[in-house]
């Protein structure tokens, strides 16, 4: 585990992601530093790990999912043979934090060739609410695909980034924009990246771009239907969220209804909360 953790921290983008997380999130559980996590792992013993495992088996919620051709009676008999007792386990997968008008900023110099700029935005939407799919489409237009604004305008047309993308996590209300850049382009890249979001807020995108984005999302959903991990993940979300998680056909139908106005409303709810810059020096 320590070797894997150290390897992750040696990845410049992973390191920058974690530093932005520390600036953005209020909850300490989402702001764990490398040194804290490493010390916690070092402090674990065979006895403490075994005790934690027994506590988990006795008290935590356990969900079993089976996919494929199997005998339900045999599965039921096997599960009953485990001797699990009833438990009232509650799992919270949605994290919400209020927006703060105080912009958090961080910077570090590292001996790497490429600088990394990260922008963290607060999104008030939650998984399964009415803004869910408009936010997904908005992120696709912004930086989720090769035709997106960040890639086309910032990387290809302006030549300001080697790598650029955006990621949306509705379980934590967090939109991340990040780019690998030359350090002298920091201010220009930051301004232009933010301007791509401003364009979406103002509705400066074409119907062709909107349809391209929807088509990419449709394809992703269709591919997930043939992926066992995706099917189990969706079943787990249904188990936890109930009606908040629509079925496949429901997603497609709702996706078709997302229009320019819905995307503009979603984009206008997104506000800059944190900025992190890792300046590469050689």
Q: What function would you assign to each model-found segment?
A:
Residues 141-159, 171:
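M16/MPP (pitrilysin/insulinase) zinc-metallopeptidase core fold and M16-derived inactive scaffolds
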């Amino acid at each position: 585990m320590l070797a894997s953790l150290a390897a992750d921290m040696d990845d410049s983008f992973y390191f920058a992601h974690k530093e932005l997380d520390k600036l953005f999130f209020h909850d300490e559980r989402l702001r764990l530093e490398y040194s804290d996590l490493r010390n916690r792992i070092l402090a674990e013993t065979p006895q403490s790990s075994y005790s934690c495992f027994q506590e988990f088996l006795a008290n935590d919620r356990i969900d079993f999912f089976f996919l494929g051709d199997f005998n339900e009676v045999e599965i039921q008999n096997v599960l009953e043979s485990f001797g699990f007792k009833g438990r009232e386990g509650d799992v919270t997968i949605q994290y919400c934090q209020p927006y703060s008008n105080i912009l958090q900023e961080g910077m570090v110099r590292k001996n790497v060739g490429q600088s990394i700029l990260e922008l963290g935005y607060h999104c008030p939407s939650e998984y399964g609410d009415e803004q869910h799919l408009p936010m997904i489409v908005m992120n696709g237009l912004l930086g989720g695909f090769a035709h997106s604004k960040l890639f086309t305008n910032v990387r290809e047309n302006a030549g300001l980034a080697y790598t650029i993308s955006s990621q949306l996590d509705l379980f934590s209300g967090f939109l991340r924009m990040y780019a690998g850049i030359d350090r002298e382009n920091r201010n220009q890249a930051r301004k232009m990246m933010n301007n791509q979001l401003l364009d979406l807020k103002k509705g400066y995108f074409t119907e062709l771009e909107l349809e391209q984005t929807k088509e990419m999302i449709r394809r992703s959903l269709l591919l997930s239907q043939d992926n066992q991990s995706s099917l189990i993940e969706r079943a787990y979300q249904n188990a936890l969220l109930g009606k908040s998680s629509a079925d496949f056909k429901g997603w497609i139908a709702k996706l078709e209804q997302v229009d320019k106005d819905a995307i503009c409303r979603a984009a206008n709810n997104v506000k800059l909360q944190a900025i992190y810059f890792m300046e590469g020096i050689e």
